[in-house]
A protein has these predicted regions:
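Mature extracellular or lumenal effector domains of secreted proteins
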Residues: 1-122
Length: 122
Protein backbone atom coordinates (compact mmCIF):
# COMPACT_ATOMS: atom_id res chain seq x y z
CA UNK A 1 0.00 0.00 0.00
CA UNK A 2 1.14 3.55 -0.67
CA UNK A 3 0.21 6.60 1.35
CA UNK A 4 0.07 10.20 0.14
CA UNK A 5 3.74 10.76 1.05
CA UNK A 6 4.56 7.91 -1.38
CA UNK A 7 5.71 5.77 1.55
CA UNK A 8 5.16 2.07 0.85
CA UNK A 9 4.06 -0.43 3.51
CA UNK A 10 3.17 -4.09 3.20
CA UNK A 11 1.37 -6.87 5.03
CA UNK A 12 1.72 -10.57 4.31
CA UNK A 13 -0.22 -13.58 5.58
CA UNK A 14 1.06 -17.15 5.52
CA UNK A 15 -2.52 -18.43 5.31
CA UNK A 16 -5.41 -16.87 3.36
CA UNK A 17 -8.56 -18.70 2.31
CA UNK A 18 -12.14 -17.94 1.34
CA UNK A 19 -14.87 -20.43 2.19
CA UNK A 20 -17.64 -21.72 -0.08
CA UNK A 21 -20.81 -19.92 -1.13
CA UNK A 22 -22.78 -22.07 1.34
CA UNK A 23 -20.83 -20.36 4.16
CA UNK A 24 -21.14 -16.89 2.58
CA UNK A 25 -17.46 -16.87 1.51
CA UNK A 26 -16.12 -16.80 5.07
CA UNK A 27 -12.57 -15.38 5.25
CA UNK A 28 -9.73 -17.06 7.12
CA UNK A 29 -6.35 -15.32 7.49
CA UNK A 30 -3.42 -15.93 9.82
CA UNK A 31 0.34 -15.70 10.03
CA UNK A 32 0.74 -11.93 9.72
CA UNK A 33 4.05 -10.22 9.03
CA UNK A 34 4.53 -6.71 7.73
CA UNK A 35 6.52 -3.53 7.56
CA UNK A 36 7.26 -1.68 10.79
CA UNK A 37 4.24 -0.03 12.39
CA UNK A 38 1.72 -1.35 9.88
CA UNK A 39 -0.39 -3.38 12.32
CA UNK A 40 -2.51 -6.40 11.47
CA UNK A 41 -5.71 -4.73 10.25
CA UNK A 42 -6.87 -7.65 8.09
CA UNK A 43 -7.08 -10.14 10.97
CA UNK A 44 -10.21 -8.32 12.24
CA UNK A 45 -11.96 -9.71 9.14
CA UNK A 46 -10.88 -13.31 9.76
CA UNK A 47 -13.86 -15.55 10.47
CA UNK A 48 -16.30 -13.05 8.98
CA UNK A 49 -18.71 -13.73 6.14
CA UNK A 50 -18.70 -11.52 3.04
CA UNK A 51 -21.12 -8.57 3.11
CA UNK A 52 -22.47 -6.61 0.17
CA UNK A 53 -24.90 -3.70 -0.04
CA UNK A 54 -27.78 -6.11 -0.58
CA UNK A 55 -26.64 -9.03 1.64
CA UNK A 56 -25.57 -8.04 5.17
CA UNK A 57 -23.40 -10.50 7.11
CA UNK A 58 -21.50 -8.11 9.37
CA UNK A 59 -21.87 -7.97 13.16
CA UNK A 60 -23.09 -4.36 13.24
CA UNK A 61 -26.65 -4.56 14.56
CA UNK A 62 -27.84 -1.13 13.44
CA UNK A 63 -26.56 -0.89 9.87
CA UNK A 64 -25.00 -2.64 6.90
CA UNK A 65 -21.27 -1.84 6.81
CA UNK A 66 -21.08 -2.44 3.04
CA UNK A 67 -23.59 0.39 2.56
CA UNK A 68 -22.14 2.72 5.20
CA UNK A 69 -18.52 2.30 4.04
CA UNK A 70 -19.36 2.13 0.30
CA UNK A 71 -17.97 -1.27 -0.60
CA UNK A 72 -18.33 -4.99 -0.10
CA UNK A 73 -15.92 -6.72 2.32
CA UNK A 74 -15.56 -9.10 5.26
CA UNK A 75 -16.70 -6.59 7.89
CA UNK A 76 -16.96 -7.17 11.63
CA UNK A 77 -18.44 -3.94 13.03
CA UNK A 78 -16.06 -1.21 11.94
CA UNK A 79 -13.65 -1.66 9.05
CA UNK A 80 -10.04 -2.04 10.10
CA UNK A 81 -9.15 -2.59 6.45
CA UNK A 82 -11.50 -1.53 3.67
CA UNK A 83 -9.97 -1.77 0.20
CA UNK A 84 -13.26 -1.48 -1.71
CA UNK A 85 -14.39 1.93 -0.53
CA UNK A 86 -14.74 4.86 -2.91
CA UNK A 87 -11.33 6.14 -4.05
CA UNK A 88 -10.49 9.57 -2.64
CA UNK A 89 -8.17 12.05 -4.30
CA UNK A 90 -5.60 13.93 -2.23
CA UNK A 91 -7.91 16.81 -1.28
CA UNK A 92 -10.48 14.35 0.18
CA UNK A 93 -8.17 11.59 1.46
CA UNK A 94 -6.74 13.14 4.62
CA UNK A 95 -9.05 14.31 7.38
CA UNK A 96 -12.17 13.57 5.36
CA UNK A 97 -15.25 11.66 6.41
CA UNK A 98 -14.98 8.92 9.04
CA UNK A 99 -13.92 5.52 7.61
CA UNK A 100 -14.60 6.46 4.00
CA UNK A 101 -12.28 5.51 1.18
CA UNK A 102 -9.52 2.91 1.22
CA UNK A 103 -8.43 2.48 4.83
CA UNK A 104 -5.86 0.49 6.81
CA UNK A 105 -6.84 1.68 10.27
CA UNK A 106 -4.06 0.40 12.53
CA UNK A 107 -1.40 2.53 10.82
CA UNK A 108 -3.33 5.44 9.35
CA UNK A 109 -6.58 5.72 11.31
CA UNK A 110 -10.14 6.20 10.13
CA UNK A 111 -9.64 9.65 8.60
CA UNK A 112 -7.00 8.68 6.04
CA UNK A 113 -7.68 7.08 2.67
CA UNK A 114 -4.71 5.40 0.98
CA UNK A 115 -3.33 6.60 -2.34
CA UNK A 116 -2.74 3.09 -3.69
CA UNK A 117 -3.05 -0.50 -2.59
CA UNK A 118 -2.55 -3.86 -4.19
CA UNK A 119 -3.74 -7.23 -2.93
CA UNK A 120 -2.29 -10.46 -4.29
CA UNK A 121 -3.13 -14.07 -3.59
CA UNK A 122 -0.29 -16.39 -4.52
Amino acid sequence: MKDWNDSISWAEYSSFSVGPESDNYRLSVSGFSGSAGIGDSLSYSSGRQFSTKDVDHDAHLESNCAKVYSGAWWFFRLPQYAPNGVYKNFSEAIGGMYAQGTIWNLKYGYYYSLKEFEMMVL
